[in-house]
UniProtKB/Swiss-Prot annotation:
Its EC number is 1.1.1.-, 1.1.1.300, 1.1.1.54, 1.1.1.216. Has no counterpart in murine species. GO terms for molecular function: aldose reductase (NADPH) activity; all-trans-retinol dehydrogenase (NADP+) activity; allyl-alcohol dehydrogenase activity; estradiol 17-beta-dehydrogenase [NAD(P)+] activity; farnesol dehydrogenase activity; oxidoreductase activity, acting on the CH-OH group of donors, NAD or NADP as acceptor; testosterone 17-beta-dehydrogenase (NADP+) activity. Substrate binds at residue 111. It holds the Pfam family Aldo_ket_red. This is Aldo-keto reductase family 1 member B15.
Length: 316
């Protein structure tokens, strides 16, 4: 079983990576070091997570220890929508590169398709509490990102949270130089994203699954929300394979050729989450897990839905 997916650029993206959203300062550095020791080579970062300097420290320490070389690692980061105006893309990118203490990124993503008002606030709101859109669009940001590829600062570009209409707009953009290599979206058995995955794969775009375990630690979780890790059917499948429910959920993506980036700050879980290459789910088990789909999102971003380019109104 391949432990990577091949991008349209022929680069190899490790199929399991470490997610770092909500990885707390003071803890994320250790988490990244544990992950590298456990043979993770793919680390998923973002300007918005405000912890890239610690991720960078961990990477540098591991490189200095000769535990890993930079070229063995696959580092992804993202530009936030308050930076969509062309000069700001570079400003945000330069901070990311400096924080991560790297000379290049393997993939740079657009974090979210809607442009927000520029400024220091990640979620700019008017006096009524409504989000304010910005002048820059994802197409403007893409042009600035293409320059980073031309300069050798980024190997490839991608998107996140895009629906297929938005990807079409990007692919059909006049003068497009570089196609997106991946679309990173929320994906798990309650949101299987079958049509979107099929569409992306048909265009040579890989899919990366964030919140593959259903984001159990999200701050806005309600007691009545479904819990994937506690799902009796998934527990049953896990017991049969002598694996944890998390390992089954991660394996589910791997068998769909979907890259998966579970986040954990617990060393034992970090190690466990990559021990997913020594078992295989049967076709029947895959079908059972796929049948759980209910188009339920842990992240619905409803507060952005009044702005242009909201991605989740489309079927896929």
């Amino acid at each position: 079983m391949a432990t990577f997916v091949e991008l349209s650029t022929k680069a190899k993206m490790p199929i399991v990576g470490l997610g770092t959203w909500r990885s707390l300062l003071g803890k994320v550095k250790e988490a990244v070091k544990v992950a590298i020791d456990a043979e993770y080579r793919h680390i998923d970062c973002a300007y918005f997570y405000e912890n890239q300097h610690e991720v960078g420290e961990a990477i540098q320490e591991k490189i200095q220890e000769k535990a890993v070389m930079r070229e063995d690692l696959f580092i992804v980061s993202k530009v936030w929508p308050t930076f969509f105006e062309r000069p700001l893309v570079r400003k945000a990118f330069e901070k990311t590169l400096k924080d991560l203490k790297l000379s290049y990124l393997d993939v740079y993503l657009i974090h979210w398709p809607q442009g927000f008002k520029t400024g220091d606030d990640f979620f700019p709101k008017d006096d009524k509490g409504n989000m304010i859109s910005g002048k820059g669009t994802f197409l403007d940001a893409w042009e600035a990102m293409e320059e980073l590829v031309d300069e050798g600062l980024v190997k490839a570009l991608g998107v996140s949270n895009f629906n297929h209409f938005q990807i079409e707009r990007l692919l059909n953009k006049p003068g497009l130089k570089y196609k997106p290599v991946t679309n990173q979206v929320e994906c798990h058995p309650y949101l299987t994203q079958e049509k979107l995955i099929q569409y992306c794969h048909s265009k040579g775009i890989t899919v990366t699954a964030y919140s593959p375990l259903g984001s159990p630690d999200r701050p806005w979780a309600k007691p009545e929300d479904p819990s994937l890790l506690e799902d009796p059917k998934i527990k049953e499948i896990a017991a049969k394979h002598k694996k944890t429910t998390a390992q089954v959920l991660i394996r589910f993506h791997i068998q769909r050729n979907v890259t998966v980036i579970p986040k954990s700050m617990t060393p034992a879980h970090i190690v466990e989450n990559i021990q997913v290459f020594d078992f295989k789910l049967s076709d029947e088990e895959m079908a059972t897990i796929l049948s759980f789909n209910r188009n339920w999102r842990a992240f619905d971003f409803k507060e952005f839905s009044h702005l242009e380019d909201f991605p989740f109104d489309a079927e896929y």
